[in-house]
Amino acid sequence: MNIFCKIILPLLCIISCSERKEIEVYNMELDENKKEVLVEIRNNTENNYYLLSPIVSIMTKHLQYIDGEMIEGQIHHKKLDSIVCSVYIWDDICKEEYYAMHEIVLLPKKSVKKIKYKYDNEEYIEIVHIGFPYNGYYNEIGKKMQFMLKKKLDSSNIIKGYEFYDKDIETMTIKM
């Protein structure tokens, strides 16, 4: 018993603690009656972060993709939006004909944030997927742009006490 407490127990703690991600999709549920998708994102860190425009994509049985519209859990900020558009000039939201703004999801430290999406589709849903378009680029151009965006957003300190989370976030997909 003494060996277990001194060697194995600390080893198990190290292994289990190292597997936990900084920011992770904790849960995702589809309510076909309400036509809503609930996504829970957990911040396991001691820092307050924010994400830009997490996207829910829904695929129907006829292989039609539709995007969910975020209806709960987000804020908007004009100055932050203009900074994003100064870096990502080809972003659809940044084009003049669109009157939308990027969704900002605040992730307070050591918490779970609930985000709700609405969709309008009568077909049977096959797959629901959450993705993070401003996180975890793998090509060099994407990495440079992401670095520039983080630098501009964090130096502007638009959302007091929060910083932009730009690291990769593992996506989640549920199949019906």
Which residue ranges define each predicted feature?
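Short, surface-exposed ligand- or partner-binding patches at beta-edge/loop junctions that are enriched
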Residues: 120-148
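Short beta-strand elements
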Residues: 142-176
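Bacterial Sec-dependent N-terminal signal peptides
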Residues: 1-26, 39
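Short, solvent-exposed loop/linker segments at the N-terminal edge
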Residues: 29-33
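The feature marks short-to-medium sequence segments in extracytoplasmic or secretory-pathway proteins
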Residues: 48-107
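Asparagine-centered strand-capping/turn motif at beta-strand->loop junctions
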Residues: 39-48
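Structural beta-strand segments of beta-rich domains
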Residues: 35-37
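Short Pro-Gly-centered flexible turn/kink motifs
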Residues: 105-119
